[in-house]
Amino acid sequence: MNSQETEIDKEKELEQKVQEYWTCRAHDFSTVRKNELKDNEISGRWLAEIGQNLPVSSGLDILDVGTGTGYFAILLALHGHRTTGIDFTRAMLQEAEETADSYAANASFLYMDAQALDFPDNSFDAIVTRNLTWTIPEPEKAYQEWHRVLRPGGILLNFDASYADNVRNHNQKESYVSFKDVYGHCGITPELEKKNAEITLSMPGSCKSRPRWDIELLSKIGFSNVSVDKTAGQRILREKDLPDAPLFLIYAKK
């Protein structure tokens, strides 16, 4: 077996671990996102943050990459956009579809790899994604695909954080903060938290200086007007923003 085949096998193994983790978490994670949908204040903050970065307030074709249980896709569909959510975990998509039905939200959901999108070029006006890029084995490949399916002038809004920094502080009691403590995540056992830490530190982005690394990748791929807002978490999550892994917003235009 050559080095390239070995690398491919490692990536597939890592993807499988990610899928298994989120399959296990799907139902409990859905509870968290349903609570957010019910919370007009937090949903209003997300809508304000996204809306101020989009060219119009409704009627856009928007792709929610790594939709999970469908929060962004449902929220934006309820406010007049045509949304498609994709995810690589079927259990998450099942939760998303059930939640969308309960809200009568006109959002569609597809099983798809964020690194290999099954859409024609120039399909979407905007791409939104939340807490995804830290879970991707090949971020550059994903960014290239996102650039491809955006229409000219299309917008990428990537909300993420350098979660590896929080994991690395696990043994520093005064610094480390568990997701279940600040985000209200339920069903997280010590075993699941350990798996999450292992996955996080296995990803390429875990050893990079983020979001600077992302900015360099996006510029290299051909995005323009690339910028980062490191205070997004303070406005949206407020006291729930992780001190060691604050939420940032990466904006990029095709």
Residue ranges and their predicted role:
Residues 2-57, 71-75, 95, 155-190, 232:
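Conserved class I S-adenosyl-L-methionine
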Residues 115-126:
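A short acidic, Gly/Pro-enriched loop at the edge of an enzyme's catalytic core
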Residues 126-139:
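A short SAM/SAH-binding and catalytic strip from SAM-dependent methyltransferases
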Residues 63-65, 69-116:
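Class I SAM-dependent methyltransferase SAM/SAH-binding core
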